């Protein structure tokens, strides 16, 4: 098997064994092929066999990812496949010149409606039922309906009864005008059948079948048995296609202790055409998460808002609906209702959510396994701690610590440390790293707490050496692995290794390290922004100092302690202000420094 398919092959082993559709994507996230299966895992596995056709080999050379959508039955998978292929027109799927689609049953909107098979939808108020995959079964049921119910077949009026009237298959509405009420009852019965309410007709068919057997008319009995089976199959509610509905999204949130999967099943013209899954690590309850997600998701710039948004958790929707409709100039509705149809769609959403969460965890596990091998670790890096140093022009230096468990942020483990070993104005990242590593791991050792599996330092060889020297001093260099990740080149450095490790962009192992590094960087910058904002806002409390001038004081003079090192003349010269204002700034800084207006966790 080609090396670039190894990760896909592992993913296939974890696919569900239920029915559904699979989508094969290129490196550029373009859908190359869409297929359906009774057993997704078994079907997709076939693409990884040694003996596959030349065309399949060409396809698999271009496949970078595989996604699946589970369904409740093989029948629904077939309909979904049809809908998806029509929507996306993948390069490797068959392109039919005569893309006539599957047949439907149409009940016209005429005074005396006709009931017939069609493959085309006309928006004239007619009712459509289907589509149906097996045209033969559809023909059998239509034949049964035509023989059981005396419906109109003729397109035009006639002065004389038609052949169907003489055969007992028509009431004669083509030439009579007094049968509207009777005819309406016949059509209502047909609607009941097509909506799955067929028990009475099934009973009648069963009686006729038994009578045929008694008469030893086995040919008729076999035909009646086929009709009965076809009737049951065609009347089953198909949740993949909803011909009499407008476009709609169904949103389901599946929550676990550490992660939420938000599944959006998108229907277009009544057909399921897309599955969108978002992962969320927030700690909101389901109702609050539902409200926040809908607001953010549908107010995004390029998001197309459907006619209806169905949710499975009852929330207050009035303000959210108003906001979406005003911002997007739409008339959407947010609906929470429990019907037979929505329950079935929810079951499909739950299935896809569980698969997505399992796949997400499996992807993380594979990435951690890859990282373990790359760093030559003896165990999986289940717990990673990342560090970053930040300061304000050499002042207020802090170190941020972020913790990741199984590749996901563990926010209870986050810390921010005030660095005490540096003088005001002193910039020394190596010294800061030594201090924070010493403080962090001395505490863990003294309190007999578990060490992380991996420590990540934001920086290069110098920062790595500083951290490693402290670990050696604590005699834990063999108990925990430490590495550094340089920002620009994205090169991984390890102790006692002269050459760094350069991984390809998009490598899952590299992405885990980048996530840890970026989160540590974000945390440090976030703290410093808060600190900077507090200082700036405090400067603006000086009489005569506005927002812009307060910002300029911070930029030009620095923090309170920096200002204490200057006299009034120096302040006036640097800020280009008079002595009176310089004295105010100096006095204010002295007062604020005494209050010690900032605080840091340690």
UniProtKB/Swiss-Prot annotation:
One cellular-component annotation, GO: cytoplasm
Domain GIY-YIG: 17-94
Signal peptide span: none
Disulfide cross-links: none
HAMAP family: UvrC (MF_00203)
Biological role stated in the UniProt entry: The UvrABC repair system catalyzes the recognition and processing of DNA lesions. UvrC both incises the 5' and 3' sides of the lesion. The N-terminal half is responsible for the 3' incision and the C-terminal half is responsible for the 5' incision.
Protein name: UvrABC system protein C
């Amino acid at each position: 098997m080609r090396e670039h398919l190894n990760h896909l092959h592992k993913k296939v082993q974890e696919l569900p064994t239920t029915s559904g559709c699979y989508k094969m994507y290129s490196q550029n996230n373009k859908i190359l092929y869409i297929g359906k299966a009774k057993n997704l895992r078994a079907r997709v596995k076939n693409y990884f066999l040694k003996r596959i056709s030349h065309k399949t080999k060409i396809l698999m050379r271009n496949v970078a990812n595989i996604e699946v959508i589970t369904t409740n039955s093989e029948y629904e998978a077939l309909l979904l496949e049809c809908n998806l292929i029509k929507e996306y027109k993948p390069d490797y799927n068959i392109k039919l010149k005569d893309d006539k689609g599957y047949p439907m049953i149409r009940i016209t909107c005429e005074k005396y409606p006709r009931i017939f098979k069609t493959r085309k939808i006309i928006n004239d108020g007619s009712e459509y039922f289907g589509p149906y995959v097996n045209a033969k079964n559809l023909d059998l049921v239509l034949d049964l309906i035509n023989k059981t119910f005396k419906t109109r077949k003729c397109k035009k009026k006639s002065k004389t009864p038609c052949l169907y009237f003489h055969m007992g298959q028509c009431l004669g509405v083509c030439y009579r005008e007094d049968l509207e009420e009777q005819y309406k009852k016949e059509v209502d019965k047909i609607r009941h059948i097509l909506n799955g309410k067929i028990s009475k007709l099934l009973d009648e068919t069963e009686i006729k079948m038994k009578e045929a057997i008694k008469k030893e008319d086995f040919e008729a009995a076999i035909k009646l048995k086929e009709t009965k089976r076809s009737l049951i199959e065609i009347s089953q509610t198909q949740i993949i296609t909803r011909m009499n509905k407008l476009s709609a999204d169904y949103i389901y949130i599946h929550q676990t202790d550490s992660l939420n999967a938000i599944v959006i099943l998108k229907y277009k013209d009544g057909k399921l055409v897309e599955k969108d899954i978002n992962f969320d690590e927030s700690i909101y309850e389901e109702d609050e998460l539902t409200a926040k997600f809908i607001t953010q998701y549908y107010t995004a710039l390029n998001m197309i808002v459907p006619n209806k948004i169905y949710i499975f958790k009852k929330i207050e929707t009035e303000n959210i609906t108003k906001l979406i409709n005003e911002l997007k100039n739409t008339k959407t509705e947010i609906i929470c209702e429990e019907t037979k149809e929505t329950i079935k769609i929810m079951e499909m959403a739950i299935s896809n959510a569980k698969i997505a969460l399992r796949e997400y965890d499996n992807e993380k596990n594979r990435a951690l396994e890859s990282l373990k091998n790359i760093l030559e670790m003896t165990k999986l890096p289940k717990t990673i701690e990342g560090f970053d140093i930040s300061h304000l022009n050499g002042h207020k230096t802090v170190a941020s610590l972020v913790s990741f468990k199984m590749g996901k942020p563990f926010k209870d483990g986050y810390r921010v440390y005030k660095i005490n070993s540096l003088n005001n104005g002193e910039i020394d990242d190596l010294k800061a790293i030594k201090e924070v590593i010493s403080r962090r791991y001395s505490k863990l050792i003294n309190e007999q707490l578990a060490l992380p599996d991996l420590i990540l330092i934001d920086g290069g060889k110098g920062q790595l050496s500083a951290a490693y020297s402290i670990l050696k001093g604590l005699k834990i260099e063999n108990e925990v692995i430490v590495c550094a990740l340089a920002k620009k080149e994205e090169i991984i450095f390890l102790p006692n290794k002269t050459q760094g490790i350069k991984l390809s962009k998009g490598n899952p192992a590299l992405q885990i390290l980048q996530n840890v590094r970026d989160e540590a960087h974000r945390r440090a910058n976030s703290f410093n922004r808060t600190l900077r904002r507090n200082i700036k806002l405090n400067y603006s409390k000086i009489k005569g100092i506005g927002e812009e001038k307060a910002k300029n004081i911070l930029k030009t003079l620095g923090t309170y302690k920096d200002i204490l090192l200057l006299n009034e003349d120096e302040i006036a010269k640097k800020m280009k202000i008079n002595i009176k204002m310089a004295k105010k700034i100096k006095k204010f800084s002295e007062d604020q420094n005494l209050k010690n207006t900032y605080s840091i966790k340690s």
